[in-house]
Amino acid sequence: MDLRLLNFRGPRGWIEALGLAALALASCLVFYGRVLAGRERFDLPAFAAALQQSGLSILPAITLVMIAIGLILGHQVEGILTQFDLPVVVILTVAFVIIIEVLPVLVGILVAGRAGVALAVRQATLLATGEMDGLLVCGIEPLSFTLAPVLLAMLLMSFAFLVWGTLVTFAVAGAWLWASTGVAPSLFLEMLTSALTPGTLIEALVKPLLFAVLIALVATLNGIGAGRRPGGVAGAATGTMIGAVTAILVTDLLYIVLVRV
């Protein structure tokens, strides 16, 4: 499949969509390999801009959301502990759910809302203005040019956000429980350590990376699928947000059903 054969009209049907997604991912992997081999130059300014867009610009929002999750978590655990004096069981269960399910999904949704939408809008704008044709004329592969720096930034920032979000969430929740129920920080930390088995850590770290790849591919499908109409830019942004959230939730469900034992 080639973008010139598609005439930048985007995929028609799910088979072409899967083909374009595979083509986009393959072009990025080939590009990364050529960069590592010293046969290609990496666009550092574009990568820095992508880091700013997908990371630093939403760090305050990420932090605020994680603080809110920590307060909610602390309040809910406090309510359970007033009825059942089983802090070990409660904290272990809640910590597992938060680390494995809630935080990766929240990080994915926030990254999709910022970096994913921005990528789709940029690609749709390049199409509408004819700049995508200019890239082809100059011998530049449009997919790797627009996607590769953003995908790498998404992967790095998704990993960093998960680590940061976990620290913030459980620091706030632990402080709440210490102040309201007297659960010692040492006991809280011990329960978290017990919940974080190697398998749990691997799953918690892999999910945001998988979600980042899905977000980038969904954004590319919507950006390329916007066509050459200026009005397609708004549709690309909306489609990316809806498609990315749907892909994240469905993938998470499939992971639970098919992979987790």
Regions found by a protein language model. Give the residues of each.
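Selective transmembrane-helix segments that form parts of the transport pathway or gating/packing helices
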Residues: 55, 59, 63, 102, ...
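Short cytoplasmic-facing helical segments at TM-TM junctions of multi-pass membrane proteins
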Residues: 122-148, 230-233
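Membrane-interfacial helix-loop-helix connectors in multipass membrane proteins
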Residues: 75-99, 164-209, 213, 217-239, ...
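Hydrophobic alpha-helical transmembrane segments of multi-pass membrane transport proteins
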Residues: 90-128
